């Protein structure tokens, strides 16, 4: 989908699943973490004009897909999954929360702040193909949704291209509205959220999208 910076933990989870599927391991730990809320990290993203300027209302600054979104809010944290061969997990008697049915990646390296639609389209189609699923079999999508003007619009365009008319029936949210953007830790924690959504099953509240951009509806 994009350069490794914000996707490497999802790559790690997908590759770990493939390692288990090949029979090279029974159990893998995979995920990511990031801690970049510092002068260098904030200064770099500020110079790129990627951060929200809503300093007067920081609690309302991270608002993916909202018409007044103006950039992301940096977050810190970690998310790690325990991946395990199904027979191995059953033999141990552990609770199984979800199955990784498919995985796609597309490091198109187009541009770090102005992504192309082609990358996420190929990524989602690859995941569907590996899972042996049709687009209309998907109910929920945890979007990348960083709260940037160009990035969110590009992602919605890609979702529409992959899912067609079914896109209007998808439950789509961005949990970055609650956590901010964890960069290299985003995929790990968002994978945990997605597993929890399957477990409960619920789609977690999408905060602060007061009015969705008209061209994104």
PLM features: what roles do these ranges have?
Residues 2-9, 205-212:
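Conserved small/polar residues in nucleotide/adenosyl-binding loops
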Residues 9, 16, 45, 82, ...:
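Conserved small-residue
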Residues 56-131, 140:
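Condensing-enzyme catalytic core mediating Claisen C-C bond formation in acyl metabolism
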Residues 109-120, 146-163, 182-189:
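Short glycine/threonine-rich loop-to-helix capping motif typified by GTGT followed
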